[in-house]
């Protein structure tokens, strides 16, 4: 993930959350995330992005948009720790495109949100602020 703050590497947990990972990969390959902002950044908690209403010129309020459909939660044994990549939602099975990266462990979110990856480059993640842009999300097969 190329951001204004720098590159953030993502390891996706396809075995733990296959549908969530497939959705994220599809959106990334379609360019959905390109130009979006991290619209909710709370130091010590998390940085949230992926809302199309954070795009320049969008009419909706940032944090309220999605891809036009919902995906089911895939709760798994992965824990919310520093660097966790998880799907945001407004209630069970209402996720779509918004995701967040944890700055540190958030055990109260375990079993509530789908953890579908882990980030590297936490030094870059910690540089994110409200409004930091995602330039492009590129997918590389391992």
Q: What does each model-found stretch correspond to?
A:
Residues 1-142:
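Cyclophilin-like peptidyl-prolyl cis-trans isomerases
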């Amino acid at each position: 993930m190329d951001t204004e703050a720098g590159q953030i590497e993502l390891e996706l947990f396809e075995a733990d959350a296959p549908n969530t990972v497939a959705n994220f990969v599809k959106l990334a390959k379609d360019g959905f995330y390109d130009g979006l902002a991290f619209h909710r950044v709370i130091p010590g908690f998390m940085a949230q992005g992926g809302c199309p209403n954070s795009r320049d010129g969008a009419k909706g309020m940032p944090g309220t948009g999605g891809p036009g459909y919902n995906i089911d939660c895939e709760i798994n044994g992965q824990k919310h720790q520093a660097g966790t990549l998880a799907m945001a939602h407004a209630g069970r099975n209402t996720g779509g495109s918004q995701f967040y990266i944890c700055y540190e462990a958030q055990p109260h979110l375990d079993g509530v949100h789908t953890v579908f990856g882990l980030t590297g480059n936490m030094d870059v993640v910690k540089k994110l602020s409200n409004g930091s842009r995602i330039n492009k999300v590129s997918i590389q097969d391992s």
